[in-house]
Swiss-Prot record:
A GO molecular function held by the record: transcription cis-regulatory region binding
Family according to the record: Belongs to the krueppel C2H2-type zinc-finger protein family.
Domain KRAB span(s) in chain numbering: 8-79
Official protein name in the record: Zinc finger protein 658
Source species, domain of life: Eukaryota
The organism of origin for this protein: Homo sapiens
PROSITE patterns on file: KRAB, ZINC_FINGER_C2H2_1, ZINC_FINGER_C2H2_2
Chief location bin: nucleus
UniProt KW keywords: DNA-binding, Isopeptide bond, Metal-binding, Nucleus, Repeat, Repressor, Ribosome biogenesis, Transcription, Transcription regulation, Ubl conjugation, Zinc, Zinc-finger
Gene Ontology biological-process annotations: cellular response to zinc ion; negative regulation of DNA-templated transcription; regulation of transcription by RNA polymerase II; ribosome biogenesis
Keyword Chaperone: no
Function as written in the Swiss-Prot or TrEMBL entry: Mediates transcriptional repression in response to zinc. Represses several genes, including SLC30A5, SLC30A10 and CBWD1, by binding to the zinc transcriptional regulatory element (ZTRE) (5'-C[AC]C[TAG]CC[TC]-N(0-50)-[GA]G[ATC]G[TG]G-3') found in the promoter region. May play a role in the control of ribosome biogenesis, regulating predominantly rRNA levels, as well as those of several ribosomal proteins, thus coordinating this highly zinc-demanding process with the available zinc supply.
Subcellular location: Nucleus
Sequence position, cross-link Glycyl lysine isopeptide (Lys-Gly) (interchain with G-Cter in SUMO2): K178
Length: 1059
């Protein structure tokens, strides 16, 4: 005889609650209920029960409440809408009846060592096919014909719960037991103390009348109707059982026992050998469950115990990478049946419904129903915690969970560490953190996680996946429900960014809408996110809850701590794709990449100057506003930047935290250390685009470029004089104030600038830290080294705008320009004489004081000028470093070389203002001008004879001393003057270097050439005072005066004069 198989749905092995019933359960009872339900479902899956994951299981796995007002609301609007399709889908996909795979007879059951029932031989429960085909259920309450019993159950449960019509079980077939129960509203279980009746499922009774037996809990000796409470994994095989309470001796079903144990807290179970203490019944059951379950399922790979088989199975699949379910179309593998079924619906295009208002197609029923609330804007639940937020919710579970932060309630507690949580999912997730095992590992980077959801979020970093997309604006969202919470008009505000988290999306939407609902009660500042508000409030409270375990430094933000810890680890996870440079912070990488792109997105509204960083723009704004918000507590000085303040405070503390690894020298600033290290490396990364000169520092390059641009941005407020360098301005301002802050401890000399004092100290110490890489010569100042290096390179970067002459040093250019301007800013306080150079003034003042601080180590001779001492040293060494490029002649002084070059070129740039006479050297002009003034400042100490020139005085003094220090090497003749020796030597050599431009005649001496040139010019500069006759040479004047006028006077005295 042909028989059809009757299949069983998941509802046959589950317990459902109404809203009122769920309210009576306590936290421990709800947790126990969740564990039982999840365990039952895991065993159904393990024996091949293929089904889309029930909604109640999904809720329990997420830690949500299994009952919500949404279910009741949807069933009122769409009676039987969900369970019909669910049952149809199961029957269409099921290849053979599940009765054969799940249920076994009582005779075929055996008991394992752990006390679990083992499935060995299945049995069949058969129904006549003619009856099976005619099954049709009718609801008498509202006269509806329903195709299956489950649909009738839903309809009757919602509309006719108060009716008490009874149906014959045998006449209506056992399949209508649920419908009969809904009409009967039977209440067969009663508590003896308060005679309260309860209504729960009894549909297992007719199927398993022969399987009734009573289970007793080994831990407390308490009789229970269902061994599930005592951790029997086959609770779905048992029908209703007898539950025995030791105190009341009453029978209860599962949920009645839960409620009874919740109210009856007086009862204690005394003999718990596992824990050695007495406790209430609820705690005993829970402890017994935890104790026994942890030993049932153990992972051999990781050594971790599980209370249910499903986590063990999932753990093993994670380790082995085994996937039980494979897609036929795309060959994608899945470790869970629920994920496989959802994937098949996606590929097949099996969409539950398409919404009429927005044409969005959704794959799941819950998504469709929840999506409808977006358009209707139905939010049933309103939070009114003392008028704090007035926030509304679609679901009551969300409202309850939202209210816990307001009330401070933490209902769920983890017993290992006594930590409590607001959400039921948190203590479930917490043990993984507490124990330290992480089941879920990333295949890309090897990072492990306690929760699969965290692994899924982490994988989006590698895949850059944004899970869901809204067609309205091109954005990606966490779910279709969140994606449609804003209209397409709102989405047009930006260009399609993507977000992988719901919180990110909501925060981004508030930015677009300008919404800032969270306000600080201290300062009134508003924020778009509550996390931003909490972080901001720590500014007022000073709270820094995050502490570094390495250095004990505390931070107000957890992200700041994470970033700080990279200082200790040296981690630089962010790498530039262009140059490969790595950075500690992502923001630093983005800022660095602007170097390659040249992007400067931040523009000043006052001067339109652009910046690569927003911080640089803010700092720049303070130039316009003059704001200096950061003040030093020690000296009261204020600064525009906090970094400058911190660096300034090191002056007071003396701290120098930055040390050079090469030489051990320490610095106050990190930038100073980096600049110093370039001395060791010789690196000069900054190059001038005009002259290609390189510099070790960017600031030096900017200062150098002012030479080409002529820019002088620093102006003196007193005299309006401008300067190219800020340091030069500060030094100049000390001239007006007369203040000299820096004093030498050795000699007491004071200076305007600290750098001048540092340079001066090297005179006492003899330190010369700057060495020439070409010749090894050392210098006390870096500027001296730079000037010296130009001798090797021949570079003369400073050019005169008037005559085009170039100079090695800028100071030489400035002095030269005074020739054209006639400026002599330095005046002698004694005689009022002015000088174009400060050094000339200092040398002149020594004439009045008689000071000669520079002494020759060879002969002990002293000099007023250091340059004169150096020139004197060359007499002993015979050094003549200055060579003429035309004739090869060398000179000991550069002034002699310049005079020699002018002799060859005939250049005479210096002109007498009185007579217009020109000279090749400036000293010649000064000496010549004394002819007009009659000044003779140099006087002989022996005879008192004055002289116009110092050189003439020195020559004269040799008459008194008889000194003739210059000797001819050829004939041994000695001379008192070097010029006389040079002239004498030309007799031996026959050299005549001085040539007349008019007739080409050559002479041995320059004085002879000058006398000869008077023949061509007709000049007779020497005039007789007696008769007014003029002569070309001075010697001729003397002869004339002797012969004519002296002789006449002699004759007149002797009586021979004319009568």
């Amino acid at each position: 005889m042909n028989m059809s198989q009757a299949s069983v749905s998941f509802q046959d092995v589950t317990v459902e609650f109404t809203r009122e019933e769920w309210q009576h359960l306590g936290p421990v009872e709800r947790t126990l209920y969740r564990d039982v339900m999840l365990e039952n479902y895991s065993h159904l899956i393990s024996v091949g029960y293929c089904i889309t994951k029930p909604k109640v299981i999904s809720k329990l796995e997420k830690g949500e409440e299994p009952w919500s007002l949404e279910d009741e609301f949807l069933n009122q609007r769409y009676p039987g809408y969900f369970k019909v399709d669910h049952i149809k889908g199961i029957r269409e996909k099921q290849e053979k009846p599940l009765w054969q795979e799940i249920f076994i007879s009582d005779a075929d059951k055996t008991l394992s060592k752990e006390g679990q029932k083992v499935l060995e031989k299945p049995f069949n429960l058969e129904i006549a096919p003619e009856l099976s085909e005619k099954i049709s259920c009718k609801c008498d309450s509202h006269r509806m014909n329903l195709p299956v019993a489950s649909q009738l159950i839903i309809s009757e449960r919602k509309y006719s719960r108060k009716k008490t019509e009874y149906m014959n079980v045998c006449e209506k077939l056992q399949l209508d037991i649920k419908h009969e129960k809904a009409h009967a509203e039977e209440k067969s279980y009663e508590h003896g103390e308060n005679a309260k009746a309860f209504s729960y499922k009894k549909d297992q009774h007719w199927k398993f009348q022969t399987l009734e037996e009573s289970f007793e809990c080994d831990g407390s000796g308490q009789g229970l109707y269902d061994k599930t409470i005592c951790i029997t994994p086959q609770s779905f095989l048992t029908g209703e059982k007898s539950c025995k309470d030791d105190e009341f001796r009453k029978n209860f079903d599962k949920i009645t026992l839960f409620n009874h144990m919740r109210t009856d807290t007086r009862g204690k179970c005394s003999d718990l050998n596992e824990y050695g203490t007495s406790c209430d019944k609820t705690t005993a059951v829970e402890y017994n469950k935890v104790h026994m379950a942890m030993t049932h399922y153990e992972c051999n790979e990781r050594g971790i115990n599980f209370s249910r088989k499903s986590p063990l199975t999932q753990s093993q699949r994670t380790i082995t990478g085994w996937s039980a379910f494979e897609s036929n179309k795309c060959e994608e593998n899945f470790s869970q049946s629920s994920a496989h079924i959802v994937h098949q619906k996606t590929q097949a295009g099996d969409k539950f419904g398409e919404h009429n208002e927005c044409t969005d197609a959704l794959y799941q029923k819950l998504d469709f129903t929840a999506h409808q609330r977006i358009h209707t804007e139905d939010k049933f639940y309103l939070s009114d915690e003392h008028g704090k937020c007035r926030k509304s919710f679609y679901r009551k579970a969300h409202l309850i969970q939202h209210q816990r932060p307001h009330s401070g309630e933490k209902t769920y507690q983890y017993e290992e560490c006594a930590k409590s949580f607001c959400s039921s999912s948190h203590p479930i997730q917490h043990p993984g953190t507490y124990v330290g095992f992480k089941l879920y590992e990333c295949n890309e980077c090897g990072k492990a996680f306690c929760q699969n959801s965290n692994l899924s979020k982490h994988l989006r970093i590698h895949t850059k996946e944004k899970p869901c997309d809204n067609n309205g604006c091109g954005r990606s969202y966490k779910s279709p429900l969140i994606g449609h919470q804003k209209t397409d008009a709102e989405m047009e505000l930006c260009g399609g960014s993507e977000y992988g988290k719901t919180s990110h999306l909501k925060g981004h939407q508030r930015i677009l809408m300008g919404e800032k609902p969270y306000e600080c009660i201290e300062c009134g500042k508003t924020f778009s996110k509550t996390s931003h508000l909490r972080a901001h409030q720590r500014i007022h409270t000073g709270e820094k809850p995050y502490e570094c375990v390495e250095c004990e430094k505390t931070f107000s933000h957890k992200t700041h701590l994470s970033v700080h810890q990279r200082v200790h680890t040296g981690e630089k996870p962010y790498e530039c794709n262009d140059c490969g440079k790595s950075f500690t912070y992502n923001s630093a990488l983005r800022a660095h990449q602007r170097i390659h792109t040249g992007e400067k997105p931040y523009e000043c509204s006052d001067c339109e100057k652009t910046f690569a960083h927003n911080s640089a723009l803010r700092a720049h704004h303070r130039i316009h506003t003059g704001e200096k918000p950061y003040e030093c507590n020690e000296c009261g000085r204020s600064f525009a930047h906090i970094s400058v303040l911190k660096a300034h405070q090191r002056i007071h503390t003396g701290e120098k935290p930055y040390e050079c690894n090469e030489c051990g020298r320490s610095f106050t600033y990190n930038s100073a250390l980096r600049a110093h290290q370039r001395i060791h490396t010789g690196r000069k990364p900054y190059e001038c685009s005009d002259c290609e000169k390189t510099f070790a520092h960017n600031s030096a390059l900017k200062i150098h470029q002012r030479i080409h641009t002529g820019e002088k941005p620093y102006e003196c407020n007193e005299c309006e004089k401008t300067f190219a360098h800020n340091s030069a301005l500060r030094a100049h301002q000390n001239i007006h104030t007369g203040e000299k802050l820096y004093e030498c401890s050795e000699c007491g000399k004071t200076f305007f600038q600290k750098t001048r004092l540092s340079t001066h100290r090297r005179i006492h110490t003899g330190e010369k830290p700057y060495e020439c890489s070409k010749c090894g010569k050392t210098f006390s100042q870096k500027s001296y080294l730079s000037g010296h290096e130009r001798i090797h390179t021949g570079e003369k970067p400073y050019e005169c705008n008037v005559c085009g002459k170039t100079f090695v040093y800028k100071a030489a250019l400035i002095v030269h320009q005074r020739i054209h301007t006639g400026e002599k800013p330095y005046e002698c306080n004694q005689c009022g004489k002015t000088f174009s150079q400060r050094t000339h003034l200092c040398a002149h003042q020594r004439i009045h004081t008689g000071e000669k601080p520079y002494e020759c180590n060879e002969c002990g001779k002293t000099f007023a000028d250091n340059s004169a001492l150096r020139a004197h040293h060359r007499i002993h060494t015979g050094e003549k470093p200055y060579e003429c490029n035309d004739c090869g002649k060398t000179f000991s002084k550069t002034s002699h070389l310049r005079a020699h070059l002018r002799t060859r070129s005939g250049e005479k740039p210096y002109e007498c203002s009185e007579c217009g006479k020109t000279f090749s050297e400036k000293s010649y002009v000064s000496a010549h001008q004394r002819v007009h003034t009659g000044e003779k400042p140099y006087e002989c100490n022996v005879c008192g004879k004055p002289f116009a020139h110092n050189s003439t005085l020195r020559v004269h003094q040799r008459i008194h001393t008889g000194e003739k220090s210059y000797e001819c090497n050829d004939c041994g003749k000695t001379f008192s003057q070097k010029s006389h020796l040079s002239a004498h030597q030309r007799i031996h050599t026959g050299e005549k270097p001085y040539e007349c431009n008019e007739c080409g005649k050559a002479f041995a001496q320059n004085s002879t050439l000058r006398v000869h040139q008077r023949i061509h010019t007709g000049e007779k500069p020497y005039e007789c005072d007696e008769c007014g006759k003029t002569f070309v040479r001075k010697a001729a004047l003397r002869v004339h005066h002797t012969r004519m006028h002296t002789r006449e006077k002699t004759l007149a005295c002797n009586g021979f004069g004319k009568s």
